[in-house]
A protein has these predicted regions:
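Serine-dependent amide/ester hydrolase catalytic core
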Residues: 13-14, 124, 303, 326-434, ...
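General small-molecule cofactor/ligand-binding pocket signal
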Residues: 120, 294-299, 440
Length: 487
């Protein structure tokens, strides 16, 4: 492996500007790494070599002319395969979209290409972003770079594994209930979900529109901050996009956090926590105290309801959003239907995987006449209570911390026959999506088997700069982020 691939995006940018390496060389080195690793890792559904090298050549031309480079120009990136890139397959890891070629770019893709960021390929995911282990892909499972027998987390497992294994330096994922933060935790990297509306969802294949948010993966907090800056901003094509100026998130990374009020979420520090994760949390609390922060315990009384709320609201929205995949306009169509109704039924039965079908049925039930008030409406009311818990908590503290997950990565197949156990993996992450607040997972140590542990940090809406500052100070107080998977 080219040693430069192990470096951060900030270090790679410096090497490009100093002409120590060309963007084409860096991109080709990343493709070589992918060809070495990906048969056993399974992180990519497809590669976009021509697009990536074309972008890299533009970077080299700018350098040759002595022109300034846009932020992150020339840095290899993977795009989760539920975001559109014109002319490439966008499958959402589903048979129903197996041969769908995108006719337009997602807004985040446009922003990346505008900043000359080479997009090397489309990263594997749980089908339609539904899952916590990346075992639900219709094509292949993703393996954890730290131990190939274990899951990388989901649903953005391919994005996380590609960054963790140094196939690419950066990646984009989407987070509906923890789908960026959980794989970041399991793969020992940084993963961040912005405030809802901070990043445009235009061109993202929808799962649950009121919860979905695109965010960055990186190996350092600084790189994640810069990637969020590139993809943020108002988009008239997305009605939920916030009309706010883009911040320079990396500007406050090194601000002193003396006196920062840190709240430890009481409900996420009790039963179910593995001994290794509990020890890592204790160490993280001590680290913040040494940095001058004041640490207190905070209770979020309605947090215990968050999984129930989420699996009513998310499945209801999924049932509605996925109705468009019916075999009429695009995607897979069953070859042997005798009439229109049979074509709908067979196409969806053959095209969707078991987890997607389970969620469509759950959501359709929650929205059906007679159950709407009992389930969907009540879940919306409870969502407001969870959000209010955060509002009250942030009156007392500046940030909240918890484990990203009560446990480290589990073995492939260990939970696939028990959906409820799989759903509980997201116990710590779901509430941030319900409340629309920004959250991040940063490396916080390793368990007895050498598997990464993640610390989750949450901040009030639109306080991404505070989040990055608190995360960066913790990151630099340790060397966890410097340790790479030995794959």
């Amino acid at each position: 492996m080219n040693e430069l691939l192990k470096k951060s995006a900030a270090e790679q940018s410096k090497a490009l500007k100093n002409k120590e390496v060309s963007a084409v060389e860096l991109t080709n080195a990343a493709f070589e790494r992918i060809s070495e690793l990906d048969d056993k890792l399974g992180a990519f559904n497809s590669l976009t070599k021509d697009t990536a090298l074309e972008t890299a050549k533009k970077v080299d031309e700018k350098i040759a002319k002595g022109e300034d480079l846009p932020l992150l120009a020339g840095i290899p990136l993977a795009l989760k395969d539920n975001m559109n890139l014109i002319g490439s397959k966008t499958t959402a890891s589903s048979k129903i979209l197996e041969n769908f070629v995108s006719p337009f770019n997602a807004t985040v893709t446009e922003k990346l290409l505008g900043n000359l960021v080479p997009i090397l390929g489309k990263a594997n995911l749980d089908e339609f972003a539904m899952g916590s282990s990346n075992e639900n892909s219709a094509f292949k499972k993703v393996h954890n770079p730290w131990d190939l027998k274990k899951v990388p987390g989901g649903s953005s497992g391919g994005s996380a594994a590609s960054v963790s294994s140094c196939e690419v330096t950066l990646a984009l994922g989407s987070d509906t209930g923890g789908s960026i933060r959980l794989p970041a935790s399991f793969c020992g990297i940084v993963g961040m979900k912005p405030t809802y509306g901070r990043v445009s969802r235009y061109g993202l294949i929808a799962f649950a529109s009121s919860l979905d948010q695109i965010g960055p993966f990186a190996r350092t907090v600084e790189d994640a901050a810069n990637l969020l800056e590139v993809i943020s901003g108002h988009d008239p094509k997305d009605s939920t996009s916030l009309n706010l100026p883009v911040e320079h998130y990396a500007a406050h990374l090194n601000d002193d956090i003396k006196g920062l009020q840190v709240g430890v979420i009481k409900e996420l520090m009790t039963e179910g926590l593995s001994d290794d994760v509990a020890a890592a949390m204790k160490k993280a609390i001590e680290d913040y105290k040494k940095l001058g922060a004041e640490v207190v315990e905070i209770s979020l009384p309605n947090l215990k309801h968050s999984i129930g709320i989420y699996y009513i609201l998310a499945t209801a929205e999924c049932s509605s959003n996925l109705a468009r995949f019916d075999g009429v306009k695009y995607g897979y169509r069953t070859p042997d239907a005798k009439n229109l109704m049979e074509m709908y039924t067979k196409t969806r039965a053959e095209g969707f995987g078991p987890e997607v079908k389970r969620r469509i049925m759950l959501g359709t039930y929650a929205l059906s006449s007679g159950y709407y008030d009992a389930y969907y409406k009540k879940a919306q009311q409870m969502r407001a209570l969870v959000t209010q818990d955060f509002v009250e908590a942030f009156k007392k503290v500046d940030i909240l911390i918890s484990p990203t997950c009560p446990n480290t990565a589990f073995e492939l197949g260990a939970k696939s026959s028990d959906p409820l156990q799989m759903y509980l993996t997201d116990i710590a992450t779901i509430s941030a999506n319900l409340a629309g607040i920004p959250g991040m997972s940063v490396p916080a140590g390793f368990d007895k088997d050498g598997m990464p542990i993640g610390l989750q940090i949450l901040a009030p809406q639109l306080q991404e700069s505070r989040l990055f500052n608190a995360a960066h100070k913790f990151e630099r107080a340790n060397d966890y982020y410097l340790q790479l998977a030995k794959i």
